[in-house]
């Protein structure tokens, strides 16, 4: 009897320990699991066996726990639904003694969403529970697009959270990306700078509230889209895209290419617009009047150049032809540029007005010389085959060949002509500019400059042009420089001759590039030349004065040189020797001091 009670006590103690371990429950809340509709997902929980595994099961948490599958080491698998257990769950054990209990969910839908419970019954640890929250939703991305307009060399600050209606959870990841021309780069990934591009080196940083700072803004930043990707969970993300538009305020410069009138009575104004972005429009004003395209005697050409720095450089050239005495002798011109700025602002940049005078322009003459690029000489007018579309000029004219012509080259224009109507203005045709057309019209089949000259012409090559001879079919542009010319009639004229113009009826002549002419009738002006009585021209006087001054300067230098030679060759002056120095020897007496009167003598 005593032995029986002993067994009962031992058995009771064992049962108490067993039920105490079973009743002790370890509850572990798992992470949220996100899945797209129609996808497959596996839910896995694991445990490390210490003493004894009683059983494990998967259940879906509803109003009551619906058992999905149950596993017992001795009895095997049991599934609550009429499906094969092998396709729903699997129990595996690794080499390290870890047991994995996996639930397979295939082609899931929103109805399968909810909480799933994994239960391990262990002895003596007790019950270990892990709960997974399965969220089945489609992928959504809340995207917002913004545009920021800014000037160059400014600081740009782009927020990541801008007008966000939903509350941002504490657990999220973000990244900054930049995209241009279809190429996307990563700048930052959750506080880590991962972009080493030279275009952003030293210009980009991350500020508070995950703001992106870009300083200074450059032209290359125009059109770039900076995106902040905020990932709340695998099925929901926010994207804030900001496109940058960059503007630059242009610099305007207006110049007059020729400070003196050329042979055809032209004035050329150049308006140069630098550091332009985006493109701008250049308009011209003459005497306060807005020019709308080409008008009578006025021609405008525009050029565009895209610099390597990204800026645009615009150039507008206005050519004014002084066609007759009816026009004003004075003209004030300036250019104005209208360029867009940030926030629908328009920048109005104007140049300084420039006033020029046409007092030196003479009306067209009856017989006009032909103009070529050869040397200048004296040639009388001919009565036929000459185009009357030239203009006389003052004796201070310079010709510069923009295409780098040498004095021996003959410029020609192809497919161009020039005609005069009523003797007042020029009309260009066949696609060449006004300047080349007027030169082509003033040239004939053979001839040279018919004016005597005091100095040979100076030919300049503009940057980017060759110094070789011009091709026969290439157009030629001319810019006046320094050459002395005058107009002969039946004899050569000096530059100081007085020219008086009169008007007569003479047929207009249309000269084409191939030398053919077409005659139209209209009033043409003729000239009368009066020789001055003194017969001395101002260039001779200037040369004489220069010669006289040079002679005086040479005589002065010669005299100074002779004086220096005389000083160098002259013997040194005699100086008598200095008188000899007398030394007085004073001997002190032995045994006594000097007397007072002797001391006074000394």
Swiss-Prot record:
Organism of provenance? Mus musculus
The coiled-coil segments of this chain are none
State where it is primarily located.
membrane
The residue range of the signal peptide is: 1-21
Reported function: May be involved in adhesive interactions of activated T and NK cells during the late phase of the immune response. Promotes NK cell-target adhesion by interacting with PVR present on target cells. May function at a time after T and NK cells have penetrated the endothelium using integrins and selectins, when they are actively engaging diseased cells and moving within areas of inflammation.
What compartments host this protein? Membrane
Bias type Low complexity, positions: 434-448
What keywords were assigned to this record?
A: Cell adhesion, Disulfide bond, Glycoprotein, Immunoglobulin domain, Membrane, Repeat, Signal, Transmembrane, Transmembrane helix
Stretches assigned to the Ig-like C2-type domain: 250-355
Quaternary structure annotation from Swiss-Prot or TrEMBL: Homodimer; disulfide-linked. Interacts with PVR.
- Which cysteines pair up through disulfides? They are 45-118, 160-228, 271-335
Q: Where is the composition biased (Polar residues)?
A: 409-433
- Which SUPFAM superfamilies is this protein grouped with? Immunoglobulin
Record keyword rRNA processing present: no
Membrane topology term? Single-pass type I membrane protein
> Per the database record, which ranges form the Ig-like V-type domain?
24-134, 138-244
Where are the residues of the annotated region Disordered? 402-478
Q: Does Signal count among this protein's keywords?
A: yes
The record's InterPro entries line, in alphabetical order, gives: CD96, Ig-like_dom, Ig-like_dom_sf, Ig-like_fold, Ig_sub
Q: Which GO terms describe its biological process?
A: cell-matrix adhesion; negative regulation of natural killer cell cytokine production; negative regulation of type II interferon production; response to lipopolysaccharide
Q: What is this protein called?
A: T-cell surface protein tactile
Name the glycosylated positions.
Answer: 42, 100, 107, 145, 153, 163, 195-196, 258, 281, 306, 330, 348, 415, 436, 514
Cytoplasmic topology: which positions? 558-602
Q: Name one GO cellular component term.
A: membrane
Which residue ranges does the entry give as Extracellular-facing topology?
22-536
Q: Could you list the residue ranges that cross the membrane?
A: 537-557
């Amino acid at each position: 009897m005593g032995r029986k009670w002993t067994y009962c006590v031992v058995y009771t103690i064992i049962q108490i320990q067993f039920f105490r371990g079973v009743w002790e429950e370890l509850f572990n809340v798992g992470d949220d699991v996100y899945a797209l509709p129609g996808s497959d997902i596996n839910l896995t929980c694991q445990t490390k066996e210490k003493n004894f595994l009683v059983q494990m099961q998967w259940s879906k948490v509803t109003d009551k726990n619906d058992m999905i599958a149950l596993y017992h080491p001795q009895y095997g698998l049991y599934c609550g639904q009429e499906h094969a257990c092998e396709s729903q769950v699997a129990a595996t054990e690794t080499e390290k003694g870890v047991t994995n209990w996996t639930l397979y969910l295939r082609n899931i839908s929103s109805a399968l969403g909810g909480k799933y419970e994994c239960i391990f019954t262990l002895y003596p640890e007790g019950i270990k529970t892990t709960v997974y929250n399965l969220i089945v939703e489609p992928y959504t991305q809340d995207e917002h697009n913004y545009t920021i307009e800014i000037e160059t060399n400014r600081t740009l600050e782009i927020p990541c959270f801008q007008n966000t209606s939903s509350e941002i959870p504490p657990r999220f990841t973000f990244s900054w990306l930049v995209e241009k021309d279809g190429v996307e780069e990563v700048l930052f990934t959750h506080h880590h700078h991962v972009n080493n591009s030279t275009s952003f080196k030293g210009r980009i940083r991350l500020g508070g509230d995950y703001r992106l700072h870009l300083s200074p803004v450059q032209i290359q930043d125009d059109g770039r889209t900076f995106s902040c990707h905020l990932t709340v969970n695998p099925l929901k993300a926010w994207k804030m895209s900001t496109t940058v538009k960059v503007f630059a305020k242009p610099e305007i410069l207006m110049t007059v290419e020729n400070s003196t009138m050329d042979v055809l009575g032209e004035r050329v104004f150049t308006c140069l617009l630098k550091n332009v972005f985006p493109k701008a429009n250049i308009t011209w004003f003459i005497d306060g009047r807005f020019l709308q395209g080409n008008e009578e005697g006025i021609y405008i050409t525009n050029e565009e150049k895209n610099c390597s720095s990204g800026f645009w450089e615009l150039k507008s050239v206005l050519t004014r032809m002084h066609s007759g005495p009816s026009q004003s002798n004075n003209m004030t011109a300036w250019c104005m540029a209208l360029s867009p700025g940030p926030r629908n602002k328009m920048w109005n940049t104007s140049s300084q007005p420039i006033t020029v005078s046409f007092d030196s322009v003479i009306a067209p003459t009856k017989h006009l010389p032909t103009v070529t690029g050869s040397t200048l000489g004296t040639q009388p007018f001919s009565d036929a085959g000459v185009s009357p579309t030239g203009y006389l000029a003052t004796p201070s004219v310079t010709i510069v060949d923009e295409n780098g012509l040498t004095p021996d080259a003959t410029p020609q224009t192809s497919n161009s002509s020039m005609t005069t109507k009523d003797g007042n203005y020029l009309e260009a045709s066949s696609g060449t500019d006004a300047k080349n057309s007027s030169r082509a019209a003033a040239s004939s089949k053979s001839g040279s400059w018919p004016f005597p000259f005091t100095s040979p012409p100076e030919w300049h090559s503009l940057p980017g042009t060759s110094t070789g001879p011009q091709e026969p079919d290439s157009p030629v542009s001319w810019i006046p420089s320094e050459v002395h010319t005058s107009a002969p009639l039946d004899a050569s004229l000096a530059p100081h001759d007085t020219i008086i113009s009169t008007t007569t009826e003479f047929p207009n002549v249309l000269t084409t590039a191939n030398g053919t002419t077409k005659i139209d009738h209209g009033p043409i002006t003729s000239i009368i030349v009066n020789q001055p009585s003194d017969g001395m021209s101002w260039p001779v006087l200037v040369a004489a004065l220069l010669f006289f001054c040079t002679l005086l300067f040479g005589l002065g230098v010669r005299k100074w040189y002779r004086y220096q030679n005389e000083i160098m060759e002259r013997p040194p002056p005699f100086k008598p020797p200095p008188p000899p120095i007398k030394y007085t020897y004073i001997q002190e007496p032995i045994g006594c001091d000097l007397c007072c009167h002797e001391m006074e003598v000394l």
